[in-house]
């Protein structure tokens, strides 16, 4: 017997309603802000992620699913959604239709890491990208959209953490301060941090092992230039004016190399040590780095599996999918033909119908309808058909009535709507 690959999940049954719910809330929320959907391939040229995410990041070093195809091209299953979206923006000359461009995506991503609750090797994200605006208004909008998505989902126990990691000049001064701080600690840090010290010292702040050193590290907000400080303060002022709650975290740097300026993360209190459900920030140099024109941009993404855990932990009621509202049972050859017509009439009126496709007795058909949790059962028999009537049965109460064939749809709708 074949089994699913480690780090993947089969999604079905009652869990599906959470996926429908999140996807619908996301699409409706971002529509309010003028975002259009984009769908990119799940695999891209490996170089795209090396150039964008950063060669020294854990994603590129340890987590990417990379293989050589039959044309000897290095291909990678996408580990995140921003780089493919920006590649599509450049390749399809989207700048020609005007800026800023607002795009969103929903889909699977892939990272080879230790599977745990809410973190699989195939996982799903939705993301939002606001391309072409240098204004703090854009930074504020991204955070506002993220906050509204969470509110519209019904979540309460979340925290938005924000910071600024400045421009190249700010970070150069800050990196020197970090190097000095860690210089007498290199004998005590993990092997990854020893490597990061020489390749990208900012990544030391991502370490999950040597956290005791991180809390006393220098704060980048003390090294911001006047322009970056003003941009950060203006972003916070805009959020304050709209009463968007946030917490400043001066050690927040994000795990991808393309970020600059304002960055943020969303954490949920019911997710334990791995509490992040999403994050994002500004990436003003990424489009030029990938072959386009200098275009200031920013975005964020959230993990759908993580959001589902948060919804369940907060006991947010999620509407059941309206499947299997009516079961149509039949007894006899002529009854079967008429029952099929009735099923289609009901579907024409937007009612979900399960039609019995098995040669079974009435008792077996009713048991099947009960297992499917159908609300009603329409029973079509040869004797009833001769009198131009059918039986309508309430599967919850057992009550049933005879009605004329022509009134099946109207009566069924009344019963369903209660």
Swiss-Prot record:
Quick one: where is this thing mainly located? cytoplasm
Q: Which reaction does it catalyse?
A: tRNA(His) + L-histidine + ATP = L-histidyl-tRNA(His) + AMP + diphosphate + H(+)
On assembly, the entry states: Homodimer.
Which biological process terms from the Gene Ontology are attached to this UniProt entry?
A: histidyl-tRNA aminoacylation
Q: Does the keyword Protein biosynthesis apply?
A: yes
Query: Where does this polypeptide localize?
Result: Cytoplasm
The entry lists its GO molecular-function terms as: ATP binding; histidine-tRNA ligase activity
Protein name, UniProt field: Histidine--tRNA ligase
What is any one of the record's Gene Ontology cellular component terms?
Answer: cytoplasm
Tell me the enzyme class: ligase
Pfam families, alphabetized: HGTP_anticodon, tRNA-synt_His
Q: Does the keyword Aminoacyl-tRNA synthetase apply?
A: yes
Matching HAMAP family: His_tRNA_synth
Origin species, per record, is Thermosipho africanus (strain TCF52B)
